[in-house]
Amino acid sequence: MNFSVEDLKTVDAWRVSQGAPLRVAKSIPTSFDIADSGDWISLPDGSQVWQLHLQAKGAIALILYYSDFYIPKGARLYLYNAAKTQVLGAYTHRTHPKNGPFATQAVAGDEVILEYVPAPSGETPRLRIREVGYGYNHLEAIMPEVQEAPGAGYSEACEVNINCEEGTDWQEQKKG
């Protein structure tokens, strides 16, 4: 998919002047699935991890949107940038126990690596990436580490704050 970041910024500036919300990323439709994308890597101890490397040249950050996100109990998923200066996770079964659609926080840079560590049970995960958000503008709005730590009760704009009405379905998980 080809597009001009400068053209996007020009259109965004006009949209914001008309009262539209700030746009920080362009969604790029994709189809990556743990079942048929990425590589399984054997480690010296005999265990295996799955890795998927995604790159979108020139992006400030990448955001992943999943059509299905299920991590079996005992398994872990990590996301990190190429320099490993930002590591997200471990995402576990407790992160999103109902499975289904999900989005992960923005990862700085134009590359993201997903690394899945399987559960001892061998249960199959479901990781289906349907879109990559190509972050191109207003980095401070999508990268919390650029801002002062917000404190308890805070959630990103696209996340549900479990202390609010929208978080009613997450009260069991809130208790830990």
Segments from the language model and where they lie:
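Domain-level representation of secreted and single-pass membrane ectodomains enriched
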Residues: 1-176
